Amino acid sequence: MTEQRPLTIALVAGETSGDILGAGLIRALKERVPNARFVGVAGPRMQAEGCEAWYEMEELAVMGIVEVLGRLRRLLHIRADLTKRFGELKPDVFVGIDAPDFNITLEGNLKKQGIKTIHYVSPSVWAWRQKRVFKIGRATDLVLAFLPFEKAFYDKYNVPCRFIGHTMADAMPLDPDKNAARDVLGIPHDAHCLALLPGSRGAEVEMLSADFLKTAQLLRQTYPDLEIVVPLVNAKRREQFERIKAEVAPDLSVHLLDGMGREAMVASDAALLASGTAALECMLAKCPMVVGYRMKPFTFWLAKRLVKTEYVSLPNLLAGRELVKELLQEECEPQKLAAALLPLLANGKTSHAMHDTFRELHQQIRCNADEQAAQAVLELAQ
């Protein structure tokens, strides 16, 4: 920071989740340093907080190998241009928000020019391709991690890392209002309720929906009043799910929801879901769950050799034990899924114990992440 100019922070966000994090960070920094300047690659939320966008975030938001290859020349041009322009600007700190394939190389380029760099949101290096930790260590002055076990991993390799808590844990109440969520969804307060979340990607919905629906049919035999809610992330996934349901369980009555995943979790006595961020959100919603996941045999074979963790779901990784049942590949079949869900729908000891542990884990990662991230940026800027 120099006296001639305000605190200058450069940021690059590559997708909507990064734009939300970036906006929260900018807001927290502006409260401390009102005249700070923010520049870089920003989405609408970051721009609304006052970030100058040298490039729109959509330029980086490409998914899949084919799409990335098609845009590779443009992506490389943007990264080279940012390296040059940030090098000339000499910001007090550069913050790369997620988008590791783009940002970590950029961070390394800038660090070589004497610019302090932060990588915000750890890639899953603790789970697979662990050698990436060495590249991250060379490229960044600090990693900001959402989860405590991520910091423990970086500590092993002497890479500076700060656990800041999870923004989702900050955003969700410790004690959600189940009846209020049921009122929103039109679910009777006294009914048993199951949420089915077969994933956000097309391949997941294709692989999991049939077994999830058959599981719900089995559970209806025990709980005839069972209300089934199925939140789907967009119209495409909804069409896909409806097609599969018409083939597998045409007579099964369900509530199809456009989005509203969080409301569905809060309203439900139990959830059956694919792994991923949904499992963390379900934990924070205090909804007992079973994780069911299947992928193509070769992909699973490869994953077993690459993935270094004992569990796949974040609640189990946070707890350090099998807190929630994980049924993968051939284990992910209706009889076993239903058997794991039955004690949760009973609302007895099993689900109460799970609920209490979920609450403890929520408190552990509820640390006001925006404020913690802002503090880390300012300390590095000194």
UniProtKB/Swiss-Prot annotation:
The gene is lpxB. It is an enzyme of class 2 (transferase). Condensation of UDP-2,3-diacylglucosamine and 2,3-diacylglucosamine-1-phosphate to form lipid A disaccharide, a precursor of lipid A, a phosphorylated glycolipid that anchors the lipopolysaccharide to the outer membrane of the cell. GO terms for molecular function: lipid-A-disaccharide synthase activity; phospholipid binding. This is Lipid-A-disaccharide synthase. GO terms for biological process: lipid A biosynthetic process. Pathway: Glycolipid biosynthesis; lipid IV(A) biosynthesis; lipid IV(A) from (3R)-3-hydroxytetradecanoyl-[acyl-carrier-protein] and UDP-N-acetyl-alpha-D-glucosamine: step 5/6. SUPFAM superfamilies: UDP-Glycosyltransferase/glycogen phosphorylase (SSF53756).
